[in-house]
Amino acid sequence: MSAAETGSEPSQGAGPSEATLHSLREAFNAGRTRPTEFRTAQLRSLGRFLQENKELLQDALAKDVGKSGFESDMSEIILCENEVDLALKNLQTWMKDEPVSTNLLTKLSSAFIRKEPFGLVLIIAPWNYPVNLMIIPLVGAIAAGNCVVLKPSEISKNTEKVLAELLPQYLDQSCFAVMLGGPEETRQLLEHKFDYIFFTGSPRVGKIVMTAAAKHLTPITLELGGKNPCYVDDNCDPQTVANRVAWFRYFNAGQTCVAPDYILCSQEMQERLVPALQNSITRFYGDNPQTSPNLGRIINQKHFKRLQGLLGCGRVAIGGQSDEGERYIAPTVLVDVQETEPVMQEEIFGPILPLVTVRSLDEAIEFINRREKPLALYAFSNNNQVVNQMLERTSSGGFGGNDGFLYLTLPALPLGGVGNSGMGRYHGKFSFDTFSHHRACLLRSPGMEKLNDLRYPPYGPWNQQLISWAIGSRSCTLL
């Protein structure tokens, strides 16, 4: 289960409006979003939205998932501001036609790739990072020149309210719209034809979205989840590993799609790692983590009940406490976990960390490779060869050696899954490229027709030899 798994009652809000969608498409067809000046103005307005409503967004995130101001700043607002700034600085460069080399046959022509907006795009965001996972794709869609329909998650209802009420005040409402509702409203929205769909959520819901997109042959990006492995080598300092793993496992109460979902290590390392994890948890959240302002809460009762059920897997080595009234689950470590148990069959998406023992690096790699490809994979070792072996012999959306998801702070690196964890990528220029159609263009002179005679029938050995030489491939049969 992942970010877009729903189950709450639909929030009150507007369903898909034919008139709104028609108006947005008309605005795009009129070319309103194409000029650089328009895109720049909208990006600047988006930056102002983040700056002027920072406290409102922080309050909403605190109410929804108990995020501290630090977590809201680091994982939501600052990253969004960075993306806006990067797009503003590089927009003209990104938009430029990209010249490509020609062969002898097209030597006197102009060949280039033009980046064009797709048109009307739909962005569906989840509840776990409801600002980040809506605004960062939006930056790319605006920069690429699209009109956009935004669908925030109804589960993070306080953040949804801020986004729905305030964001439209900063953007051109003839080109951008926020639509509200739950699963049924989203289903209705997906019945309409869009030119691109960007979805973040679970593989289960991702398949539903992809099926809907297929009816219109709509291209799509799916940012999904999965069970992210974390391998810990015997030569590691257990306290260093514990500090880093505990921080990015329990960040946002474990409700992070790139968080480590389980640890693979030897029995010997497990015996050293468990007390080190206890030290880290106490250091980060105190003797009673329930009173810590730095530990979030589970999003709703449905997810709380699901996570409570997973506490019965294996043996609780650390934590295990819960409080339904507060939707609190303590930072928990499970040991003696079997691969067949429920905690190893679904994405946990909570502050629970199972430890699974393996006898070797090879066994760990085999364990990982017989499962679905994860969104992220982590390896800790003092031996670079071990980290490189894990990198070279596995497949995942992203990879971290001796650290967690700090790579997400680098817009020069793409975020995206592979296989069951998704398709497509974004962040930085990757977002611009995702929301742009790369159009192949060749412009030739209308004159000098005599030069074209060699490609016209009737064909003979001389034509064939010259054409093969001119296009640089004797095996080519296109001309």
Swiss-Prot record:
Main localization (coarse): other
One Pfam short name: Aldedh
Coiled coil: none
This protein's record includes keyword Cytoplasm: no
Keyword annotations: Lipid droplet, Lipid metabolism, Lipoprotein, Methylation, NAD, Oxidoreductase, Prenylation
Propeptide: 477-479
Tissues expressing this chain: Expressed in testis, white adipose tissue, lung, small intestine, kidney, spleen and liver.
Subcellular location: Lipid droplet
EC number(s) stated in the UniProt entry for this protein: 1.2.1.3, 1.2.1.48
One of the record's GO cellular component terms: lipid droplet
Residues lipid-modified (S-geranylgeranyl cysteine): C476
GO molecular function (one): long-chain fatty aldehyde dehydrogenase (NAD+) activity
Superkingdom classification of source: Eukaryota
Post-translational modification: Geranylgeranylation is important for localization to lipid droplets and enzyme activity.
The family this protein is said to belong to: Belongs to the aldehyde dehydrogenase family.
Protein name, as recorded: Aldehyde dehydrogenase family 3 member B2
